[in-house]
């Protein structure tokens, strides 16, 4: 690649830019002279310190040490995972140039949108082609087909010569979307960027990325779509919000996708800071599954003692004998691991294991469940989003745990009934007493079904 292919649309540290110099024909110039020719800004300004990459201003999120020259040096802790942004150094930021319009459509997807999907898709395209590109919120229930819903927008932006990024806070979501996006736009070379990915950055028309990787982007995209916008870590990260803002070109279109908008998004909608398009029904026209609630007593105490208490044991035996892949959600990692260990002798005919966010074999285990090599996966909330399994059965143990919010309960429940040939399934919430989040989730699931029914979007009552 040429030097500009590495730098365009990016915000890089001095160390990263020096690596570009080493690996390109820029080596023909003196490093200092070449660096001085590039547009740049201070990596940190202050004190009080402000990070030029992520916008961090929290004095607790900076670290000062004594450099080799005896002078104090400060760096940002908020975006440290992508390399140090340090005082006395510079950031090199270059906007991406305009892209080239395409002569023919890059969309190879042969599917068909439902009328309600098509209506929202058309509104997004009209917003892109209009004079005022106000931020858009697509509030579509789990299983509504929100990824396919944005295909016409992607097609139009790409045809017009724009660059598009579909970003998500979760690696699992990116890995779920990657094959679908590549199949839908088979003529384009779509790059997938996340920590540890095989793809390296190039200036391409279509990018799939984690929101963390956007910390390296600068005015790179004409259209930026953030999927699962209410998910951790994006939802609570000022740095990632800043990364999204900076990655979008001036005048670009920002679209948020979620099934469970948080209070901030709803407030922005009510205040007119964004436009909301709501889709309260799944693509197959069946209602969202509602949970069966079951009191199971003090199961954490039993688990800590190395046993499954009788009510829980009986329920999990029944759950294990259900057809199809099974997800057993457990609030905390030690509980998930202990539960999987106790389930193996209880359900000897099943292939099962546990999984969590820091599990190095996480992707292998998810793939094994997809392929039928695993029957049951005991999981934390890491699989509440971005995993679509036909005929999936779900049991949420400790549904009343304070870790579980209204949104997380709805997302976990949303793994059930996503396929048209089996639009329902087991959805069990096991608890020691109903929590406020449980009541809120049940209320919203019911309200969404009622809205869908009132709009004539459901095929069944």
What are these regions (language model features)?
Residues 137-147, 157, 162-177, 315-344:
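Conserved strand-helix element at the start of the C-terminal RecA-like helicase core
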């Amino acid at each position: 690649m040429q030097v500009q292919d590495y730098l365009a649309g990016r915000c890089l540290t001095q160390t990263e830019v020096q690596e570009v110099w080493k690996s390109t024909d820029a080596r023909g110039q003196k490093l200092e002279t070449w660096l001085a020719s590039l547009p740049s800004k201070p990596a940190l300004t202050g004190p009080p310190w402000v990070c030029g990459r992520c916008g961090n201003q929290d004095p607790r999120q900076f670290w000062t040490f004594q450099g080799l020259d005896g002078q104090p040096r400060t760096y940002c802790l908020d975006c440290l995972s992508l390399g140090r942004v340090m005082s006395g150094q510079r950031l090199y930021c270059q906007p991406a140039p305009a892209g080239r319009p395409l002569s023919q459509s890059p969309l190879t997807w042969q599917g068909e949108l439902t009328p309600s999907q098509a209506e929202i898709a058309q509104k997004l395209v009209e917003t892109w082609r209009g004079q005022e590109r106000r931020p858009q919120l697509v509030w579509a229930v789990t299983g509504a087909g929100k990824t396919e819903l944005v295909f016409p927008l992607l097609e139009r932006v790409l045809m017009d010569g724009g660059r598009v990024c579909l970003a998500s806070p979760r690696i699992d979501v990116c890995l779920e979307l990657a094959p679908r996006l590549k199949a839908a736009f088979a003529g384009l070379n779509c790059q997938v960027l996340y920590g540890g990915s095989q793809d390296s950055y190039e200036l391409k028309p279509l990018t799939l990325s984690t929101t963390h990787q956007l910390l390296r982007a600068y005015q790179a995209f004409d259209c930026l779509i953030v999927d699962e916008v209410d998910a951790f870590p994006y939802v609570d990260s000022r740095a990632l919000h800043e990364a999204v803002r900076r990655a979008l070109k001036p005048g670009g279109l920002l679209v948020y996708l979620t099934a469970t908008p948080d209070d901030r998004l709803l407030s922005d909608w009510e205040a007119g800071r964004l436009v909301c398009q709501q889709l309260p029904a799944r693509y197959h026209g069946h209602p969202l599954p509602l949970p069966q609630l079951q009191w199971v007593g003090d199961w954490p105490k039993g688990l800590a003692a190395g046993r499954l208490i009788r009510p829980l044991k009986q329920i999990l035996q029944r759950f294990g004998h259900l057809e199809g892949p099974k997800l057993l959600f457990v609030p905390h990692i030690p509980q998930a691991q202990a539960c999987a260990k106790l389930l193996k002798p209880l359900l000897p005919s099943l292939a099962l294991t546990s999984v969590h966010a820091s599990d190095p074999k996480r992707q292998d285990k998810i793939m094994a469940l997809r392929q039928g090599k695993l029957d049951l996966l005991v999981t934390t909330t890491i699989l509440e989003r971005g995993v679509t399994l036909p005929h999936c059965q779900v049991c949420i143990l400790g549904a009343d745990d304070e870790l579980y919010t209204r949104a997380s309960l709805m997302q976990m429940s949303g793994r059930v009934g996503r396929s048209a040939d089996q639009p329902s399934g087991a959805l069990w919430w096991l608890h020691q007493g109903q929590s406020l989040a449980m009541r809120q989730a049940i209320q919203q699931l019911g309200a969404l079904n009622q809205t869908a029914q009132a709009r004539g979007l459901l095929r069944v009552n």
